[in-house]
């Protein structure tokens, strides 16, 4: 038997018992011939002591991360030597038998949570990820992830959902983000694609009458490198038949409530909702951080007749930085550099003195009437600073949205342990293709319009008859869940009629012929009594990183990729041999399909 107990579970009531522990040498100390070892296993640490001369001689050879088994008697630590920072700190194991299960070479870095993780480069940590996972913080991250999986499953199974696996080898639909392609050896010149999401298959499951589906799904996107993105990621995927938006949101809130309970936090429900239009108007983002109460104030009408050329723009907006008037000039100059790094020309400002008098470059260039009224208009008090952005509404609001977050950080308005959730609903169904980024399953078509979420999102009922006549005004039957400024999930009521789906494709510039070639199986399925259905997908990596307080999703993935999609541990991706290339049929030309007469 390798063990009778776990190291971190030994307590005072075990005193006098003979136990066997197995684990790793976390720390070794010699004190006058007596050797002390901190033994680590998955449960934590226990102090083991080698006093017997024979086992002490054997223990003399132990080094960090040796894998060992020890048997001995649990003793109470001598008075005054207890360790209150250790769960097992009231006891020690007096060893009478030691077995070295495996030795360890010199470590590339110390496995010690007390030292700053920043002292070890991430590339090194990922190259030796199996050692990095022995650190308590990394171990606990994966345990948390497992617990979160179980909590979500429990909620869904209680509501009669079925956990169903969908294919990971499917057909490429190149209108979205780039697919990872897999050569089909038995059909030379043809390729599978790894799925960017289970979207189409879960809709087909609804057509198939499963009614309630979920899956902790692996998804793949061959995107250009962006910070804190992974080429393979996980989402909790949920789909339901015969539901409306409120039904899906209700189940989603129950899932969120269950998983946040894993860290001891009760989410107040129902979670508030705001429209996409209000999110952009007041927060400059479709994923607003509501942990602090700073709102954008529109000033376009206020400056409608201004002589100040900077404000002679389609949009003028402002935010207020409380007590910001006392900032030194170098800090105000730093704000300009900050704005320019985001593609803006700068960040105009007015300082409101303690006496209410205005100063700064903007104050000198606006009219007396504007000077008299601007502080009241934006809600600024003596001692505050008003920041402005002017230009087109989208980019100006985005700049002010970023600025409100920066102001909150500088003023210490974001408190550790604060959580703020909101649903963002009624997003546009389409956006101009020039403004789009390919993030959905079918994000880009060939026309002036592309889908904001994806091409299978239903228009809102009131837009059903007009969305293809006036795409710019159409609203989607979609809902995104936002936590602390992070979009952690998104879903929609889906299109379940083939005629509506084809109309959406047409708005996106996807012809009937192209739609039939790429999505004919879905369009055909919709003709066989497809039910109304909808669902949601949660970004599982992001959620677990938020729950655990991690800066990066890489910390909550067992074996993540580093920048550029490289795995330092296995050195993937790697070249293949000429034989593999030939056998896979990568370079073969696909056979033309025979046309039927």
From Swiss-Prot:
Disulfide cross-links: none
First-listed, main subcellular location of the protein, grouped into a coarse class: cytoplasm
Residues of the signal peptide: none
Annotated EC: 6.1.1.23
Catalytically driven reaction(s): tRNA(Asx) + L-aspartate + ATP = L-aspartyl-tRNA(Asx) + AMP + diphosphate
Binding site for ATP: 221-223, 230, 487, 539-542
Spans annotated as Disordered: 562-597
Important for tRNA non-discrimination (site feature) positions: 31, 80
Composition bias, Basic and acidic residues: 579-589
Positions of region (Aspartate): 199-202
Binding site for L-aspartate: 175, 221, 453, 494
Coiled-coil stretches: none
CDD domains attached to this UniProt entry: AspRS_core (cd00777), EcAspRS_like_N (cd04317)
Source organism, top-level taxon: Bacteria
SUPFAM superfamilies: Class II aaRS and biotin synthetases, GAD domain-like, Nucleic acid-binding proteins
GO molecular function: aspartate-tRNA ligase activity; aspartate-tRNA(Asn) ligase activity; ATP binding; nucleic acid binding
Oligomeric form and interacting partners: Homodimer.
Cited function: Aspartyl-tRNA synthetase with relaxed tRNA specificity since it is able to aspartylate not only its cognate tRNA(Asp) but also tRNA(Asn). Reaction proceeds in two steps: L-aspartate is first activated by ATP to form Asp-AMP and then transferred to the acceptor end of tRNA(Asp/Asn).
HAMAP family linked to this entry: Asp_tRNA_synth_type1
Family, per entry: Belongs to the class-II aminoacyl-tRNA synthetase family. Type 1 subfamily.
PANTHER family in the cross-refs: ASPARTATE--TRNA LIGASE, MITOCHONDRIAL, ASPARTYL/LYSYL-TRNA SYNTHETASE
UniProt-recorded name of the protein: Aspartate--tRNA(Asp/Asn) ligase
